[in-house]
Amino acid sequence: MGRIVGIDLGTTNSVVAVLEAGRPQVIANAEGSRTTPSVVGYSKEAELLVGQLARRQLVLNPRNTFANLKRFVGRGWDEMDDSSLSVPYTVRANEQGNVRVSCQVTEREYAPEELVASIIRKLVDDAATYLGEPVEAAVVTVPAYFNDAQRQATRDAGRLAGITVERILNEPTAAALAYGFDRSAARRVLVFDLGGGTFDVSLMRVANGVFDVKATCGDTQLGGNDFDQRIVDWLAEAFKTKHGLDLRRDRQALQRLIEAAEKAKQELSGVLSTPISLPFIATGPDGPLHIETSLDRPTFEGLCPDLLDRLLNPVQTALRDSGWSADDVDDVVLVGGGTRMPMVQQLLRTLVASEPCQSVNPDEVVAVGGAVQAGILTGELRDLMLNDVTPLSLGLETVGGLMKVLIPRNTPIPVRQSDVFSTSEANQSSVEIHVWQGERQLAADNKSLGRFRLSGIPPAPRGVPQVQVAFDIDANGLLQVSATDRTTGRKQSVNIQGGSTLNEEELQALLAEAEAKAGEDRRRRASIDRRNSALTLVGQAERRLRDAALELGPYGAERQQRAVETAMRDVQDLLEQNDLQELELAVASLQEALFGLNRRISSERRTDANPLQGIRNTLGSLKDELFSDDDWDEDPWNSPARSSDGRRIYRGRELNPWDDDFYR
């Protein structure tokens, strides 16, 4: 099996890691950062931007820049709450009730999985550059409380990115793998994962390389962004009260509020008060309007009591499901940037006596765990075993709309469970199997995963036919359902695909489009790389010219300096004209000119101790000007050469013994 990377696909930031020599290693992206913003955008020229490049245009181009996409993956429109839909770009429901993201500049609507695939593709490309070989497979982490729908959609995003998702791994489990893969002592671990858009808590026992998940719980619509939103609303309401304008109705102003809120939240983790300055945020009848205020930690915490309550309940539920008490927990592992907030850490201290572990990086630990799982799959790590659980109950709808649970939540996976059902009416020739996921008693209150029909049942009185329904969950937490008529042996099975917001035809069409445009994408990327390289070289040339002027004076290397200046102007002109074909030749000329200048500077540095250096610099420059056709190649300051028989030779002429004026 080839190289498999671990990918933490986060709401705010994403990370990729790989196992090298038995140790997980986080891979820096092309911009040099270990985390990549989970942002996708299109420039005004409809050029795809991913990561930091996309994030830079959030304020200036909010309609065509998309963040917090993870909250939309695998979810229907009716599942979204107001906070998730409070984004500067346009989201709407399509005819099937799925979320679609509208892009103004491309005049297209995108499924969230399409945009998320661009993030995965960038992470994989950066990993391939680091490793020096293609990466075609990955372990992708998801929140533990992701349902089957969201897991299927994540797998689809991987397919659209052109990779095989070898394993869907729960984020808290990945964090525990990173924390405990090289520890032998038995520990009971609570993983508290508060990311940008989701929240999970898992309890597991770690001992001698065995990771046994006992219980998991969470909220896929709660994260650090919700805390940001409280600051946004606080600022917007204060501004509205003072000026009568609601900044949340202006896309650019809203994005500036979001960025200021995130910055204030982060700073309040280290200080008690932070200033918030947003000049020219709006325009009123009397001119520009500004926000100049400050936010202190008590005020911020006073905005979020209900959010803290929502963090508390899953922890208590997981403890109850595991059969543990808070005193049984040995270690607390914090995951996600949201766990840096003092009020979150204080909440944990009121629940669990153990101090949170500070030995892991909350932003990177999940990707590191993904790399460990990749090592398990490839056989590089042979002494580790992971026993995960399903986060939500799975069942089917029975008479009266009740939900019959076949696989309760926190059941270890992989697992197979079956039960026998019958018909509700006489002479019923078919039955519909409707699969649901959730904890409510009525099926309609849970999440519908899909349905299929088993036909060909022989006529019989009500309750006589026997239909065996089996649920299979694989190690990825993905579900397959089958139904068998025991009388005829007729069988119908289905891989539940209801979670994906793209059907198979749409997926294949997008894959074909991506393949068709792969060459164009590569050419566009190569063009961008050439432009960036040329700009970098121009910057180097400007610095080198300044160095030469300081070290050698105005005439020390005049010919070489003039050659660099000429070549540099050619490159700049071609960059303005966007003539990439000629640019390559101009860059080569500039490199050659820089080489000549660098050689001259190095030569002067080596002989800098010579007291005649200044004179030699000037005469050398004059020589270059007067004899640039190379008809004076010898250095006049050097002694004449001697032939093999001892004769003295200068410029190809044998010297007479009386030519002493040639000697120094």
Swiss-Prot record:
One of its GO terms (molecular function) is ATP binding. The keyword Nucleotide-binding applies. InterPro entries: ATPase_NBD (IPR043129), Chaperone_DnaK (IPR012725), Heat_shock_70_CS (IPR018181), HSP70_peptide-bd_sf (IPR029047), Hsp_70_fam (IPR013126). Belongs to the heat shock protein 70 family. This is Chaperone protein dnaK1. It comes from Prochlorococcus marinus (strain MIT 9313). Induction: By stress conditions e.g. heat shock. The keyword Ion transport does not apply. It holds the Pfam family HSP70. The modification Phosphothreonine is found at residue 198. The gene is dnaK1. Acts as a chaperone. Keywords: ATP-binding, Chaperone, Nucleotide-binding, Phosphoprotein, Stress response.
